[in-house]
Amino acid sequence: MMTNAKLTRPEFLETEADYENAPEGTIVACEDSPPWHKFGSEWSSVIAYGVQDDKGMSRAIRQVLRWGWGE
């Protein structure tokens, strides 16, 4: 697995691998969906009251609002 230092911040996440490789703390969103926040290996949304894995998240292309914890 890659470390945060080896990853560059993409503008969008599209594939299951994109979501899997996003570091914890990343926040993504798209026009018709609330923001999703990555904690560990899961993505959660307070507004959508849901949890998704990387495969579930890859059903939509989302814009990266924050990469990791923003460090």
Walk through the language-model features, giving the residues of each:
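Structural boundary micro-motifs
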Residues: 1-71
